[in-house]
Amino acid sequence: MAVRQWVIALALAALLVVDREVPVAAGKLPFSRMPICEHMVESPTCSQMSNLVCGTDGLTYTNECQLCLARIKTKQDIQIMKDGKC
């Protein structure tokens, strides 16, 4: 019985640790990813095909290419926070 209580206590402690907020260091979001923008040097035009991405700047972009254009124009390190709308 004591082992079972110990396992339950350990599981609850693990849940508390997992549920804690992840600190954001140096202004960087913990789950963002870098867009692939290398092709923008050769051809700075984007298709209008909709594949929404949410930028770390809080804006929704039509696609990853549009986010790359915004990175170039604003000279900001905009990354992809998630696929879809912000």
UniProtKB/Swiss-Prot annotation:
Residues 31-86 form the Kazal-like domain. It is found in: Secreted. The record marks 48-49 as: Reactive bond. GO terms for molecular function: serine-type endopeptidase inhibitor activity. SUPFAM superfamilies: Kazal-type serine protease inhibitors (SSF100895). Residues 1-26 form the signal peptide. GO terms for cellular component: extracellular region. Disulfide bonds join 37-68, 46-65, 54-86. GO terms for biological process: response to xenobiotic stimulus. Keywords: Disulfide bond, Protease inhibitor, Secreted, Serine protease inhibitor, Signal. It comes from the Eukaryota. Gene3D superfamilies: 3.30.60.30. InterPro entries: Kazal_dom, Kazal_dom_sf, Spink4-like. This is Serine protease inhibitor Kazal-type 4. It comes from Homo sapiens (Human). The gene is SPINK4.
